[in-house]
């Protein structure tokens, strides 16, 4: 309709994607890394993917995120005791894929997935969590390159 085209052109409305087109779009996958201990680590690339990644994680898997700043959700795909080196590598990834990437001493919170909740009606990627511990990380690109990237 002409009126709709004019409204789109002026920015008052946006062209919508119908449900059939939406389903046809392939969902992107998170970054997949493998720690030096051989444990899989997944890193969300955007808010919607962070929701899926965190929502699909098992309750006893470890979840990490940069404290009080935008960043990727990181999941260590191992239940139970996590080797210290794997935890540090996951924290490096959480710091690198956050707004604190170029800062020193970036606080990275980690907790079990069971303590991460998404409030009803919250924006994509927004969660609240408890029982966390905090690591302070300063990272460089060379630190990230040392961690094996399995799939982009």
Features from the language model and the residues they span:
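Conserved small/polar residues in nucleotide/adenosyl-binding loops
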Residues: 1-4
